[in-house]
Amino acid sequence: MDEKEEILEIFKKSKALLSGHFLLSSGLHSDIYFEKFQVLQYPEYVQILCKRLAEKFEKEKIEVVVGPTTGGIVIAYEVAKNLKTRSIFAESEGGKRIFKRGFQLNEGERTLIVDDILTTGGSINEVVNLVKEYKGNIIGIGVLLDRSGGKVKFDYPLKALATVEAKTYEPDNCPLCEEKVPLVKPGSKKIDLL
């Protein structure tokens, strides 16, 4: 079993790979949803996934790992633990990411940005902008799963444990809406598992 298959198997075992008609946080619609919190509830899966992600950056001399709230907190902590460095997280406030709770980033600090699922890159770009404000040295970006099929690009190296192309649709051009498949906002209703 290759790494991608192993990662997707973890998502399936934890019942995190869902099928239906979903409203994503980006506002797009999709027929597949990865419910990250179904994976994050199992420490043994988080440990495996984050160890693998940390290994992709172990030669980079990372000094701090930063993740966006909410799932990114767990990912940043576990990756930092594996890299034997510190972790902090960026919270959303007023349409942008900020550091609270006394978190600081030092100028030039070698920074790894991590998150759980990459769809449009919105949360990661907000963290990139925050790290730039602090003049941190962004070494790379790591995600558990890139559901954009590699379409989302950053100015920094991106490493994903698995890349899948999950179709997304604009709400006004969604075939699932045309077929009158009920739209579900994840976390709000029981849905079918793959």
Language-model features and meaning:
Residues M1-V114, L118-L194:
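PRPP-associated nucleotide enzymes
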